[in-house]
């Protein structure tokens, strides 16, 4: 069945009217005292999670001022940096501040779940960014947000409209629930992976020899390069983070390479590359082949990633120094044992991190299915209503 046929069957001959958000919803305006909230029901922009992942408990609860009240069924949206896609369908009552929009339905032909799905669409976040104000810390325009159009099936027949919306929400919830289950399982597997990694890389006193990295490996600094100096090519330019900053036509590292980000927020980040790369604001570690396998050293360092991040120095732009890594002690079991450990950890790593196999791949596929069906289920023919946003509605709930 084509997407068009599916929608026609779902609507069963009913019309769809596109309405401005301000015609069917409003900003909550009621205020509550700080004493009425706690870490569980206070929602600030910082404890709304990116990419539609809901919310987590707040580490901070205000003690003064008045808070915006939210209720079950309200949609809360982080209004700072809209591109982070912070959105949550409230299942409880609580309070928030002016950095979070509380959107409450007012139309009888609109369900909270349907409103949440409509505002979870990438098109909404793109619209919000398009009209956002501020360069460094963009903030959504509240008046423009209320002009955003959402489709309402047969708005003059609330019973039929809510039934159609319920079916749309049911279909989309099926994918989100499955993704949540897979994510929970992936979290459990990562904990299991970390446990086995700790066990495999834990050696008793006297079991193996330990040496400073500077005695058993060569350290090489990256080469400065600007984007303007790059030539056409597909070789990753690796610097101070987990992903390439751009691509180049030449490489300065070949084969298995351990990379340590030198400066910035990711200073000390350990990564492993087994392809030609161009290394810039970072340094690479090259162990002696007769006693250490590069991938084994990578796993040893990656297992201590938190400790390595703690080695950062500098108040402005944090950085790590080669000489500190040269003094870092690593175990040196026999090469055959290193190979065995690497094989086990690589398999675990693929199952928990690879986007080509295992749970990460399954989660990615479910997310793509969800996005496909969300786009399909909201791709109604666009016949906007002739009614504008009710006067004054856009100012409700201003902080």
Report residues per predicted region.
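Charged, alpha-helix-forming regions
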Residues: 1-399
């Amino acid at each position: 069945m084509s997407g068009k046929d599916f929608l026609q069957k779902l609507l069963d001959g009913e019309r769809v009217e596109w309405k401005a958000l301000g015609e069917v919803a409003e900003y909550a305006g009621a205020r509550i005292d700080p004493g009425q909230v706690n870490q569980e029901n206070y929602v600030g922009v910082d404890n709304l999670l990116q990419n539609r992942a809901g919310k987590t408990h707040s580490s901070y609860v205000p003690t003064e001022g008045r808070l915006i009240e939210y209720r079950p069924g309200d949609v809360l949206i982080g209004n700072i940096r809209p591109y982070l896609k912070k959105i949550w369908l409230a299942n409880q009552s609580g309070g928030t501040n002016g950095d979070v929009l509380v959107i409450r339905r007012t139309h009888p032909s609109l369900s909270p779940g349907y409103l949440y799905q409509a505002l979870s669409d990438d098109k909404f976040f793109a619209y919000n960014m398009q009209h956002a104000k501020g360069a460094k810390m963009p903030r959504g325009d509240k008046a423009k947000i209320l002009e955003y159009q959402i489709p309402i099936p047969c708005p003059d027949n609330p019973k039929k409209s809510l039934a159609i919306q319920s079916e749309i929400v049911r279909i989309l919830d099926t994918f989100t629930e499955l993704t949540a289950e897979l994510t929970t399982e992936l979290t459990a597997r990562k904990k299991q992976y970390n446990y086995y990694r700790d066990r495999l890389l834990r050696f008793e006193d006297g079991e193996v020899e330990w040496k400073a990295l500077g005695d058993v490996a060569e350290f090489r600094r990256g080469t400065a390069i600007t984007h303007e100096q790059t030539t056409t090519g597909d070789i990753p330019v690796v610097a101070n983070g987990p992903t390439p900053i751009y691509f180049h036509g030449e490489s300065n590292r070949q084969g298995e390479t351990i990379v340590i980000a030198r400066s910035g927020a990711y200073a000390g980040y350990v990564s492993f590359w087994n392809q030609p790369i161009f290394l810039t604001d970072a340094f690479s570690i090259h162990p002696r082949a007769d006693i250490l396998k590069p991938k084994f050293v990578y796993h040893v360092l990656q297992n201590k990633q938190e400790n390595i991040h703690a080695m950062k120095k500098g108040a402005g732009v944090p950085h790590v120094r080669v000489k500190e890594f040269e003094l870092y002690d690593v175990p040196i079991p026999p090469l055959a044992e290193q190979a065995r450990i690497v094989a086990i950890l690589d398999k675990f790593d693929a199952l928990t991190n690879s986007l080509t196999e295992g749970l990460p791949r399954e989660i990615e596929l479910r997310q793509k299915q969800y996005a496909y069906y969300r786009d399909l289920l909201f791709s109604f023919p666009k016949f906007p209503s002739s009614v504008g946003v009710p006067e004054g509605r856009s100012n409700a709930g201003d902080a």
